[in-house]
Amino acid sequence: MGIDLNTVEEEAEEGAAAAVCGELWHACAGPGVALPRRGSALVYLPQAHLAADGGGGEVPPAGAAAVPPHVACRVVGVELRADAATDEVYARLALVAEGEMLQRNFREGGGEDGAGEMEGCDAEKKPRMPHMFCKTLTASDTSTHGGFSVPRRAAEDCFPPLDYKTVRPSQELIAVDLHGTQWKFRHIYRGQPRRHLLTIGWSSFVNRKKLVSGDAVLFLRGDDGQLRLGVRRAVQLRNEALFEPVNSSDSKLRILSSVASSLENKSVFHICFNPRSGASEFIVPYWRLLKSLNHPFSIGMRFRVCYESEDANERSAGLISGISEVDPIRWPGSRWKCLLVRWDDSTDSSHQNRVSPWEIERVGGSVSVTHSLSSGSKRTKLHFPQGSLDTPFLNGNGHPDSMGTENFHRVLQGQEFRGSRSHGVVCSESPGVPNFQSPDNRRFSADMRGYMMPASGPPQRNTEFTYQPIGFSESLGFPEVLQGQEMSQVVPLFRGATFGARTQNDRVVSANSVHRSAAQSGLLASTLGHPISQFTLSSSKVSSPSSVLMFNQATAPNHETVSGTNNKGMHVSQFASQEMLSETVTWPGTQRQTPSEITSNQFALARIPAPPSGAESGLPKRDAGRSSCRLFGFSLTGNMLGEDGEGLDDGAIEAGCENPPVLELFGHSHSTPGALHALCAAAPLGM
């Protein structure tokens, strides 16, 4: 039958409600809408239903039947409807009250296990809509003499195919809306560039539906080939069908009486709700409310809320500032809007200052946790396990003798410990460090810088394994040294100490070489935070790495160092001086001590014979006063210092000189870094 494009055929409300297509109803409702299915459990909140009309309507009228604030119900029927005036979709539910179900779960404290199963089955499964497109109207789409521009792919998917062999391909389309009303449009393919347009009949549809720019129109082609048409408004209009049960005192009395009758007689009562708006907050899935009751909230707890829309999901966060009932006299024990909140984005006026527990999601505990962003650099660093970060311990007291790679933690750059470390030695900032005792009854005393030295015990025993450094490629036992970090100051290992040292080939050498236990497979003691010992250089010339500056001072003090390992394989050092027994010399700024105190309280002393000179060993003798600074194998400071250094003899000098000793890359000690200071003033670190 022919249809006048300027008129539409009206049908009765009952017929329109019966003719609502489920696919079209869900398409108009939107993707974020869940409809309870038949047989599912939900909780009806009469207090929220009465307040849906606004204006403090949650107060029950005089003479109303007494009903609890939470009514557990079973869904026995679902009817899809649409408002004839606004095309807003809503549902009419048939419910049967089952109050004992909720009370039983409250007493038992259960329902948590079944909540996960009910979550997936309570919502009605949405039908698949493969042939559908939705477009937001523009100003040209809603103009009086304009048409509706359809994307090409959407037109080819939803509309019947056009005959492109003709000069001006066109056809007539008939679409049915939610109320069963048929609308006729002329579909044409024209323009430059060519496009699909709906021309005749479109203006009548826009005027009749009162569409404006920003509203959305959707077309859907079902499995039967029928073309359907729906509207989704940007701003929802008031649906009188939803507020009819609560817009007067008489209607409120009727709805409360029907709920009370259902609680007593298991009768059916009906309610209407809009799944797209907040008016449906008086219908809560049973599992959601029970889950919120099993997880109580507290003041100061942080939360977040996710709002689902057609375009995107919005998230908001806030803080619970109080817990109180809205109306404890008329609705005692009600959990509806019982949480007073303070939003993070307080400038947004759309947020309410009260929310329900089932509307929010908890985030952490009552104290807000600030998450730090990791550094952008993916270079990892190693640090020692948590514990005493300032004071190293021997023989398993904090740090084991042999530490594998599984005991190290990886940490991103910028997340290192704040403690001061230099080549594996941990420096303490605490002035008072107590004495410690190892499992083998050996006492250790710590000075103000946190270094541990043996106080008493059996003499140290040298192992058979002797390490001779042969170049930069050797990495056994050495900590990683980056370019620009080759030089560092050596802090005093004890108070009132004097050192003895001798030079060999312009190098300050120790008496013994570094010993390493053959049974120990871990790192050296220096990498575990224990005192650094001196290494013995071989008579052959040690090659300097190409990217590392090596400084040699012939005017350095003469030291004599005895190195060894304890019974656990831990490396320790014993320093001796040629004049230790005759005079006492202190470090600057420290307290003087007698040699006896040093011997009894700090460590055991040992004297060793002086190493042979260069002439005795058969090696060529170089100028003693010459300083060498090499870069890529070439000397840079050959003439920086005077050549008259032959008057220097080997002997004991005081460790408390004006300039502190300098620790070279492989542990050699120098006390006169004049050439180093002159060179560093001209060139920055990291060259």
Curated annotation (Swiss-Prot):
Q: Which Gene3D superfamilies does the annotation name?
A: 2.30.30.1040, DNA-binding pseudobarrel domain
TM stretches of this protein: none
User: Which InterPro entries does the protein's record reference?
Assistant: ARF_dom, ARF_plant, B3_DNA-bd, DNA-bd_pseudobarrel_sf
Q: Which GO terms describe its cellular component?
A: nucleus
Keywords (alphabetical) are: Auxin signaling pathway, DNA-binding, Nucleus, Transcription, Transcription regulation
GO biological process terms on file:
auxin-activated signaling pathway; regulation of DNA-templated transcription
Pfam families listed in its UniProt record: ARF_AD, B3
Subcellular localization, as worded in the UniProt entry:
Nucleus
The organs and tissues expressing this protein are described as: Expressed in roots, culms, leaves and young panicles.
Which Gene Ontology molecular function entries are recorded, alphabetically?
A: DNA binding
CDD domains, A to Z: B3_DNA (cd10017)
Q: What induces it?
A: Down-regulated by auxin under light condition.
DNA-binding residues (ranges): 133-235
Q: Which SMART domains match?
A: B3
As for family, the record states: Belongs to the ARF family.
This chain's function reads: Auxin response factors (ARFs) are transcriptional factors that bind specifically to the DNA sequence 5'-TGTCTC-3' found in the auxin-responsive promoter elements (AuxREs).
How does this chain assemble? Homo and heterodimers.
Record's protein name: Auxin response factor 14
Organism encoding this protein: Oryza sativa subsp. japonica (Rice)
Gene name, Swiss-Prot/TrEMBL:
ARF14
